[in-house]
């Protein structure tokens, strides 16, 4: 009788653990689901707020990720550090909101193979600043 009771208790505990694990995975997937794409504007250098511009200049030598808020807007910045030569651009693949974060996905695009750049002996410091509505969520860079 005791053996049967112990076996039944073990089976119930195992069932409970499996049920709780399955539920937590489902909740995690729901929190990563895209709620909506966010509208954004790529900001030119002369439109970047002064305080943010100073921080970018300090950090431009190395890759960086910065967020900045001002007047109801969220500025999301990414820099790719020092790159040899010029001809680089940055593509925004996605900017979207989930239940608990803003996801920002970009790609650094370099000069095409064989494409002449202005001067291979100089360096460039590609970075991108986008402006979107302020949402009080952390930014996840992909």
Features from the language model and the residues they span:
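Bacterial N-terminal signal peptides that target proteins for export
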Residues: 1-10
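Exposed, flexible binding/inhibitory loops of compact, secreted disulfide-stabilized domains
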Residues: 7, 22-142
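Bacterial Sec-type N-terminal signal peptides, specifically the leucine/valine-rich hydrophobic h-region
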Residues: 17-20
């Amino acid at each position: 009788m005791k053996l049967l009771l112990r076996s039944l208790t073990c089976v119930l505990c195992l069932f409970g653990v499996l049920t709780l694990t399955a539920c937590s995975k489902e909740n995690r997937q729901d929190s990563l689901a895209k709620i909506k794409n966010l509208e954004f504007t790529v900001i030119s250098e002369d439109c970047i707020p002064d305080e943010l511009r100073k921080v970018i200049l300090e950090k431009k030598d190395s890759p960086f990720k910065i967020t900045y808020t001002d007047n109801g807007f969220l500025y999301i910045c990414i820099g790719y550090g020092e790159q040899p030569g010029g001809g680089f651009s940055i593509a925004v693949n996605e900017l979207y909101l989930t239940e608990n974060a803003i996801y920002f996905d970009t790609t650094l695009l370099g000069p095409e193979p064989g494409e002449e750049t202005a001067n291979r002996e100089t360096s460039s410091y590609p970075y991108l600043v986008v402006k979107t509505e302020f949402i009080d969520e952390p930014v996840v860079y992909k």
